[in-house]
Amino acid sequence: MASLREIQMRINSTKSTKQITKAMNMVSASKLNRAQAHSAKFQPYMLKMQEVLGTIANGTTGASHPMLEKRPVKKTGYIVITSDRGLAGAYNANVLREVYREINEKHTTDSYVLFVVGKVGVQFFRSRGITVTDAITGLNDSPSYVDVAEIVKRTVSAFTLGEIDELKLCYNHFMSVISQEVKVETLLPLGEIEASSSTTYEYEPSEEQILAELLPRYAESLIFGALLDAKVAEHASRMTAMQSATDNADDLIGRLTLVYNRARQAAITQEITEIVSGAAAQQ
């Protein structure tokens, strides 16, 4: 049985760990609120662009663009969004497992390319000998479009230049504080864009020119929007994980304290027994 000193050291160590996890939980809660606000501010821009493009794409003029049209798929691009840090529960494992399963089941080595956001994702693929075509790491907790513009434009241009025939977006979608859903969505070709209203517009210059200008921006906005959504999911997952760790620390401290008290009581009983036995032996 462990000594009283060893048990007390374990209790103190667990209390120190609890302080850290509790602090991380509070920090993640604060970051979650900011990330949600940041994501919400971006939504009106994306919805308005969807409204305009949907009106053109679904109109009667027959305006079209290569980004809207399907073509035979010889190579697929994957944008995989992960975090730079761990301690976020199954946040990274879930999306990486899904992407890894899909590329193993559906692709040969030269029929896909990976664009990865986050150190965890980069390390995951490289440790398995999988080439990462492009990556970005070190994003802050509320990234701006400028922070990710290079990789976003690179992925969209890979499709428009014919380097890939479809582009998939893989990330964790925020459902609630305790729930995130892994999404693997086909981003390009865009397919049908639903108009969010019945508003009609007159366009200058032509609708084809507007599509050519706005469709790449719309695709880029979808990627950035998914990144903001994933950031919200990351903070929520980390907050939940740290709360769970704090609760587990409380349980462990309670059990160790019970063991400590029993051991202390046993030690006291042993001392009393020895004193009584010694006194009896002297009589």
From Swiss-Prot:
UniProt similarity note: Belongs to the ATPase gamma chain family.
UniProt subcellular location: Cell membrane
Its biological purpose: Produces ATP from ADP in the presence of a proton gradient across the membrane. The gamma chain is believed to be important in regulating ATPase activity and the flow of protons through the CF(0) complex.
This protein's record includes keyword Iron: no
Organism the protein comes from: Exiguobacterium sibiricum (strain DSM 17290 / CCUG 55495 / CIP 109462 / JCM 13490 / 255-15)
Main subcellular location of this protein, as a coarse class: membrane
Protein name as catalogued: ATP synthase gamma chain
GO terms under biological process: proton motive force-driven plasma membrane ATP synthesis
